[in-house]
A protein has these predicted regions:
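Conserved "landmark" site that anchors the functional core of diverse proteins
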Residues: 1-219
Length: 219
């Protein structure tokens, strides 16, 4: 990330990148307008958010709150790894999978599919078979849960996932790795690493500290 101070008439061009999925643009003291759930973003499918839930149009003015100058700061952190290691906890249905299936899940690379969207990240790789019927009793889902579908491919639940699901859940991505996961583009390679709950909790505490430090530098 990098900070900029803009004066009247200045223009800032924001270019796209093929190294990550999302980019973030932050204004000191934030935007004016309606905030829903502490956000002024727009969800056009649900028709909620600022701008009456409608998509912002080209050349439409967006107003910001009065702010002061910001100290210049720059930090570059690229995703250059050929394989992204994502840490997970064992899922609620972990026992539904054979030892062979578990070994396949943790020993092999998976590729992010082009079919990935905000509901789920679909992965392609060696098939994972379970010991029960593919469709089990539906259970509640949370962000980061990894289900194994009927074709044996894992799918990771993302921000717009459904509330319940009936596929076996082999694992769940730990909270401190979730943001990094969602920046992976189609074609990226993933390997999963199992961690215990206490380690995941400690990693999340470190993640919170790092995130707060970043926010304090750009506010």
């Amino acid at each position: 990330y990098q900070t900029f101070t803009l004066n009247d008439g200045d223009k800032l061009d924001i270019i796209s990148t093929n190294r990550s999925v999302y980019g973030y643009f932050s204004i000191k003291n934030g935007f004016t307008g309606e905030y829903i759930w502490e956000s002024c973003s727009v969800n056009t499918k649900a028709k909620i958010g600022s701008n009456n839930g409608e998509k912002y149009q080209s050349n439409q003015k967006i107003f910001i709150n009065k702010n002061e100058s910001l100290s210049e700061y720059k930090k570059i952190n690229h995703l250059n790894s050929k394989i992204e290691y994502i840490r997970v906890l064992k899922g609620t249905n972990f026992s539904f999978f054979s030892e062979k299936a578990k070994k396949i899940f943790f020993s092999n690379e998976f590729i992010v599919s082009k079919l990935t969207d905000r509901m789920g990240m679909r992965l392609e790789g060696p098939k994972i078979e379970n010991l029960v019927e593919t469709n089990i009793r539906s259970e509640g889902l949370i962000k980061g849960v990894i289900q194994v579908t009927a074709d044996g491919n894992p799918i990771i639940m993302l921000s717009d996932h459904g509330t319940i699901g009936g596929y076996p859940k082999i694992a769940v991505v730990i909270s401190s790795d979730y943001d990094r996961l969602t920046q992976l583009t189609p074609g990226s390679k993933i390997k999963f690493k199992s961690v215990e709950l206490d380690e995941a909790e400690n990693l999340y505490k470190l993640y919170e500290i790092e995130t707060k430090n970043i926010l304090n530098q750009i506010r």
